[in-house]
Regions:
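N-terminal pre-P-loop "Q-motif" helix
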Residues: 34-57
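Conserved motor-coupling elements within RecA-like helicase/translocase cores
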Residues: 99-143
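Loop/turn-to-beta-strand initiation segments
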Residues: 85-86, 112, 125-129, 142-145, ...
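Residues immediately C-terminal
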Residues: 93-96, 122, 136, 153-154, ...
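Conserved RecA-like ASCE P-loop NTPase motor core of nucleic-acid helicases/translocases
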Residues: 85-93
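Post-DEXD/H (motif II) to motif III coupling segment of the RecA-like Helicase ATP-binding lobe
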Residues: 143-188
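Walker A/P-loop
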Residues: 54-78
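Interdomain "pre-motor" coupling segment immediately N-terminal to P-loop NTPase/helicase cores
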Residues: 1-25
Length: 188
């Protein structure tokens, strides 16, 4: 038997052996701190996100389109890199994965970033990943922090398989952060 909802991820049944590998990452020189100008409100949101992450609290960053939600997560990503945590920025759409991976590579001074989506898999020796939400199902108990951008967007929103994949990709004390302009009541 197999799960009809999960068939898009490849067949997996009782005869399929599942395993988990921790990929060690050697010490990589930290990037220069990104120089991003935040408004006072963005600064407060960024500080709260960092603080909540340190306290292992899941967080919703709720702001209108164009309010700079991406810039708000720069500090938590930078701090995670400094603390050698494994972090993932997951987005439902691959075009946004491509756009953000170029932007983060530039803003984080060429720091290696693993980029994964349906058309591309660039695995770097790094603790920073940018991927589509579909890729999260392949990472069991792996990330310290998962940030899901556009959490309200298709195909992530309302897809139990993808939502569960995000949760199971986290380590035991892992933290989820959601970015959205229009979060569902379930996320709020």
């Amino acid at each position: 038997t197999y799960c009809r909802r999960c068939i898009d991820f490849g067949r997996s049944d009782d005869n399929f052996v599942k395993f988990h590998i921790n990929i060690p990452v050697s010490k990589i020189e930290a990037p220069k701190k990104p120089s991003v100008r935040l408004s006072d409100v963005q600064e407060v949101a960024s500080e709260r996100l960092v603080d909540n992450t340190r306290k292992a609290l899941n967080t919703l960053v709720w702001a209108v389109c164009g309010a700079g939600k991406t810039e708000i997560v720069y500090e938590v990503i930078y701090q995670a890199i400094l603390e050698s945590k494994t972090i993932c920025l997951a987005i439902p759409r691959r075009d946004v994965v491509k756009e953000l991976s170029e932007r983060f590579y530039r803003d984080f001074s060429g720091y290696p970033i693993s980029v994964l989506h349906g058309e591309e898999k660039v695995l770097e020796e790094s603790n920073f990943y940018i991927m589509t939400t579909h890729q999260l199902v392949k990472y069991y108990n792996y990330f310290d922090i998962v940030i899901i951008d556009e959490v309200d967007a298709f195909p992530y929103s309302g897809d139990e398989c993808l939502e569960n994949g995000a949760k199971t990709s986290l380590k035991n004390n892992g933290v989820l952060a959601f970015l959205s302009a229009t979060p569902s009541n379930k996320i709020k």
